């Protein structure tokens, strides 16, 4: 993924960290890092990161991007976007208090079904009782250009006061997450680092 700003400047090149170990993708070399850059948009500057398709299956991908300062994660995708995958994207936005924008191939592409989406990550508003739907755009199965209005001020205000994200983490207690040992039932003969 090559991310360019609106002036044509290359901001970063990202290679998918979590490659699938089947089909043609098993021949790819996984990326080594996640990147965040500041994009100067007509609506203001926004810290933007990216992950690709299968990266969304791993909560650590979005968490690393949040820790690097991302307010928005862009996710190009090429698979069926069904309720569980949409729920993953919703969860990544919610737990990291950031926006997640996904674009997917339309239903005319094999194994894809459109359903591009944007989740703004703002679960509560001070003037509303209860939680709110963080989905601000859900496209259909057809090809198209879709525009979502992301309220950056609302997102930033929310991040300053809510308890999710990085506020109450206990990183010292998560050592097991950085170990590379794989135990049953998760051992696969085609696994590679």
Question: What is each PLM-predicted segment?
Answer:
Residues 106-193:
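C-terminal beta-strand edge segments of enzyme domains
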């Amino acid at each position: 993924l090559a991310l360019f700003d609106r002036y044509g400047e290359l901001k970063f090149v990202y290679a998918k960290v979590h490659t699938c170990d089947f089909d043609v993708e098993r021949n790819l070399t996984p990326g080594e890092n996640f990147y965040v850059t500041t994009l100067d948009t007509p609506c203001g500057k926004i810290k933007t990161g990216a992950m690709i398709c299968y990266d969304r299956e791993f909560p650590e991908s979005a968490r690393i991007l949040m820790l690097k300062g991302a307010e928005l994660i862009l996710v190009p995708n090429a698979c069926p976007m069904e309720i569980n995958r949409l729920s993953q994207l919703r969860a990544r936005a919610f737990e990291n208090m950031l926006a997640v924008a996904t674009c997917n191939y339309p239903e005319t592409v094999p194994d894809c079904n459109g359903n591009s989406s944007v989740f703004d990550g703002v679960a509560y508003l001070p003037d509303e009782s209860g939680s709110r739907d963080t989905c601000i755009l859900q496209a259909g199965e057809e090809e198209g250009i879709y525009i979502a209005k992301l309220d950056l001020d609302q997102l930033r205000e929310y991040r300053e006061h809510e308890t999710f994200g990085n506020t109450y983490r206990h990183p010292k207690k998560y050592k097991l997450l950085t170990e590379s040992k794989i135990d049953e039932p998760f051992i696969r003969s085609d696994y590679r680092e």
